[in-house]
């Protein structure tokens, strides 16, 4: 399996990502397991790293690797953790303080490296979920670049201590943890700087070597000076390659030597489940169903790929939030009643939560669901057509004051589903056609729950004004976006500016004719990349055009493309940020 160091200061990391679309799921009590990988930062609804420990234990042991806490007899435990490209350790590991000091020489009593209340900027000014717990966590806006982990049965514990080689399980030849560093299979967590780029925090870890990052200024655009920061890193992608399985009945002996081209399983009357003969340790055996003769095998083959990312920064903060993948195989088709929310492989409990599976893939995996609770609402959304945006999810915390109109709209726009009852009843969902969208006939005086007919089929979508940011000197007038999944280069924008609705394609000039509403919010999908932009018109009068486009190289699946956002505007403030904040800019790209 892949090993990589949690980086020391100034060391750029190498992550491991597993391309596991074709990896079979193991439904038996033997075979492989998904390793719980806690990639959310310290304070994402859970109250800090320590609180995450209790939540990890909620994994279904029949489908997940059980969480083994650190004990006197098991000092290592099974602790998965995450890190970010600049070396800041944001862990759920129980020895977080000592590891902080040992690896980074950081005194936890010093000024935090990251803003403990950064989330309040994008959570409508509500810092409820962003209190600092002493672990330099970054609040609830740290959705991470999720690495899918596929492990053999009985994996070694993840720890900052080297395991005794004598404790290795049969067939395991190399420990995942070494004494000269901490190894993880977790991926890259997102990060937020709490100072403007012109005032670097002396406590920040040094930037990577100059050959990797490129820092170049851009002109000031209305509110504060903006800059763009580009960097790159390598990702080891493990792809599943299947190996034939041969069943033999009542053999006298197994082959003398392990084989690398197939797995031999011998079955007897006393053991119809069968037991595999010795084979190469790198082969993973998966028993898919209760039928003992239904088993597959394969290996994960590594490929190193380069990733390049451009980040646009401005003013107070910036963050990188690449997409994550949800692999839960225990989502039921029916509404889930428990007061828990699972995001990726992370489970937590909300103070007052409800969520429903809006759509499943037919195998128990959710393709679209929402969760809400407390002062924030999170929607994890996947577009229907994986061939367009792959498995693009993103989280959208909102302060809605009890209104779920924006969530309804998000589900409608991004999932092609709309709960006609206005509630979380999946039985009332209607499919929204993604073609013939030009036939929108808005009603007079649109409101949050007004329905707009899309075509003659009777399907509906809801539109609403999303959320206001008066403290940021601009607000969102409201928008919605649809995409033709068969032709992703043709995107239709539906913009409300007080005078009516407008539809146009990407690259066209967007105009506002009514100076009563001086801002516009829009989404755009193109070539598998979504970016959110917001513009404020600083003076009324003639309409001011906005031109923008995303240049997305045609990279294969498994690559994070280099994204260059070109923009040209007059009297416009372009405020890029992470994907969570509606009304501000940002980009996310597919894995």
From Swiss-Prot:
GO biological process: symbiont entry into host cell; virion attachment to host cell
Statement: the UniProt record of this protein carries the keyword Disulfide bond: yes
Disulfide bridges in this chain: 254-277
Any one of the GO CC terms: virion component
InterPro entries with a match to the protein in the record: P2_sf, Phage_PRD1_P2, Phage_PRD1_P2_C, Phage_PRD1_P2_N
Keyword Disulfide bond carried by entry: yes
Compartmental location: Virion
UniProtKB keywords: Disulfide bond, Host-virus interaction, Viral attachment to host cell, Virion, Virus entry into host cell
Primary localization: virion
Role according to the record: Adsorption protein. In association with P31 and trimeric P5, forms the spike complexes located at the 5-fold vertices of the capsid. Involved in recognition and attachment to the receptor on the surface of the host. Likely triggers the processes of vertex disassembly, membrane tube formation, and subsequent DNA injection. Essential for viral infectivity.
Name of protein: Adsorption protein P2
Naturally occurring in which organism (per UniProt): Enterobacteria phage PRD1
Gene: II
């Amino acid at each position: 399996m892949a090993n990589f160091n949690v980086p020391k200061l100034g060391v750029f990391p190498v992550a491991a990502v597993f391309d596991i679309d074709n990896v079979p799921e193991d439904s038996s009590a033997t075979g492989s397991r998904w390793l719980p990988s806690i990639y959310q930062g310290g304070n994402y609804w859970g109250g800090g790293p320590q609180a995450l420990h209790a939540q990890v234990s909620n994994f279904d042991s029949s489908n997940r690797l059980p969480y083994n806490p650190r004990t006197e007899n098991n000092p290592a435990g099974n602790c998965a953790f995450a890190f970010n490209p600049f070396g800041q350790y944001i862990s759920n590991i129980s020895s977080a303080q000592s590891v902080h000091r040992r690896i980074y020489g950081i005194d936890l009593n010093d000024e935090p490296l990251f803003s403990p209340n950064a989330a309040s900027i994008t959570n409508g000014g509500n810092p409820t979920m962003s209190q600092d717990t002493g672990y330099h966590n970054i609040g609830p806006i740290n959705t991470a670049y999720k690495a899918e982990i596929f492990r053999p049965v009985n994996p070694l514990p993840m720890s900052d201590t080297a395991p005794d080689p004598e404790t290795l399980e049969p067939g395991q030849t190399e420990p995942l943890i070494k004494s000269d560093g901490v190894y993880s299979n977790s991926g890259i967590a997102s990060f937020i700087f709490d100072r403007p780029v012109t005032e670097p925090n002396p406590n920040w870890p040094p930037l990577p070597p100059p050959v990797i990052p490129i820092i170049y200024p851009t002109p000031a655009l209305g509110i504060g000076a903006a800059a763009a920061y580009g960097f790159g890193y390598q990702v080891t992608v493990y792809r599943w390659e299947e190996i034939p399985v041969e069943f033999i009945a009542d053999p006298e002996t197994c082959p003398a030597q392990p084989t690398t081209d197939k797995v031999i399983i011998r079955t007897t009357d006393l053991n119809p489940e069968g037991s595999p003969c010795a084979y190469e340790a790198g082969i993973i055996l998966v028993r898919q169903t209760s039928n003992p003769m239904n088993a597959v095998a394969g290996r994960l083959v590594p490929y190193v790929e380069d990733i390049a990312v451009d980040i646009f920064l401005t003013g107070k903060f910036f963050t990188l939030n690449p997409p994550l993948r949800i692999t839960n195989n225990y989502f039921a088709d029916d509404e889930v009643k428990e007061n828990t929310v699972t995001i990726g492989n992370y489970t937590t409990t909300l103070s007052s939560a409800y969520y429903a599976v809006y759509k499943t893939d037919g195998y128990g995996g959710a393709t679209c669901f929402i969760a809400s609770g407390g002062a924030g609402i999170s929607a994890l959304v996947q577009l229907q057509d994986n061939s367009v945006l792959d498995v693009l999810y993103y989280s959208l915390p909102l302060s809605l004051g009890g209104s779920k109109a924006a969530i309804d709209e998000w589900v409608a726009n991004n999932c092609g589903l709309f709960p006609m009852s206005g509630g979380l009843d999946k039985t009332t969902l209607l499919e929204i056609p993604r073609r013939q969208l030009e036939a929108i006939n808005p009603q007079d005086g649109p409101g949050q729950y007004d329905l707009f007919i899309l075509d003659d089929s009777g399907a509906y979508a809801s539109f609403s004004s999303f959320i206001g940011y008066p403290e940021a000197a601009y607000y969102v007038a409201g928008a919605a976006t649809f995409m033709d999944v068969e032709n992703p280069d043709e995107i239709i924008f539906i913009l409300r500016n007080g005078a009516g609705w407008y539809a146009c394609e990407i690259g066209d000039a967007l105009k506002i004719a009514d100076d009563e509403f001086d801002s516009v919010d829009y989404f755009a999908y193109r070539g598998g990349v979504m970016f959110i932009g917001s513009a404020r018109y600083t003076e009324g009068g003639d309409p001011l055009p906005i031109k923008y486009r995303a240049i997305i190289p045609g990279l294969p699946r498994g690559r994070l493309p280099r994204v260059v956002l070109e923009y040209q505007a007059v009297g416009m403030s372009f405020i890029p940020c992470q994907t969570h904040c509606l009304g501000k800019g940002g980009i996310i790209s597919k894995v």
